[in-house]
Amino acid sequence: MLHVHILSWVLAIILFIATYLNYSKTQGASPYYKPLHMALRLFMLLTLISGFWELIEEFMAASNGEGGNHMLLTLKMLCGLAVIAFMEISIAKRKKQQTSHKFFWITIILIIITMAIGVILPWGPISKIFGIS
């Protein structure tokens, strides 16, 4: 399920940037805007489902005495929810022709923070390199 989660958020980031850039302030939406936005929502939903599944698995492992990064996992979950919310807000503001650059950059910064937290979690590459679990 971890690979599904990683694949879904990578595709969601690519689709977010493509959707955001396919709406012009002068010409409006391109013909690709609506399918891209719907695919983005599909991958955001898949990211949410797989992320919650991973969170539940980690909490169940902790109840058996195996895990213990609840605070970091909860922080990553909150950052992930904020990323998805800011993705939708920035696209909606761009569609309404309001200033959306601030929300776009907030989303990019939150994506980087969420990815950094994910990298240092027990299933992340840094933990595997140094044998931290």
From Swiss-Prot:
Keywords: Cell membrane, Membrane, Transmembrane, Transmembrane helix
Entries under InterPro entries matching the protein: UPF0344
Record flagged with keyword Cell membrane: yes
GO CC aspect terms: plasma membrane
Residues spanning the membrane: 1-21, 42-62, 71-91, 103-123
Signal peptide residue numbers: none
Pfam families: DUF1516 (PF07457)
Family listed: Belongs to the UPF0344 family.
Name of the protein: UPF0344 protein SERP0557
